[in-house]
Curated annotation (Swiss-Prot):
Record protein name field: Probable calcium-binding protein CML23
Biological process, per Gene Ontology: regulation of flower development; regulation of nitric oxide metabolic process
Role summary: Potential calcium sensor.
Gene3D superfamilies listed in its UniProt record: EF-hand
The organism's taxonomic lineage, starting at the top: Eukaryota, Viridiplantae, Streptophyta, Embryophyta, Tracheophyta
Annotated organism of origin: Arabidopsis thaliana
Amino acid sequence: MSKNVSRNCLGSMEDIKKVFQRFDKNNDGKISIDELKDVIGALSPNASQEETKAMMKEFDLDGNGFIDLDEFVALFQISDQSSNNSAIRDLKEAFDLYDLDRNGRISANELHSVMKNLGEKCSIQDCQRMINKVDSDGDGCVDFEEFKKMMMINGSA
């Protein structure tokens, strides 16, 4: 796989590696179905076993039962309009995981709740500061357009 990722929704290759390493709990260089289940469970407690299996099947490009770094990177590559549309849908799905009350905006409380479920140690004040960094309309929340801009900040959309 090419190391030259022209655009991706997480930013730099280093950012993608950090996310991968966070998911790869046992540091074996691959994400197992159990590791994927833990991540999905933290983000969406009502996700079914079938949804987790379907996600693994979709992301496990070589069919070996694991998601390796190259497969993980491939998820974030955006190279043409059709994959850009897919990336926008993926971003919307990610946004929806944070938008717990489904009002189209992520509040500091929602961000804090999700971060806590992921095992992140951050205060509500930390979450408010994160929100403020990308809140371009000053409403104290992040809407989808602000979320999209934040996620694509290191790439040219």
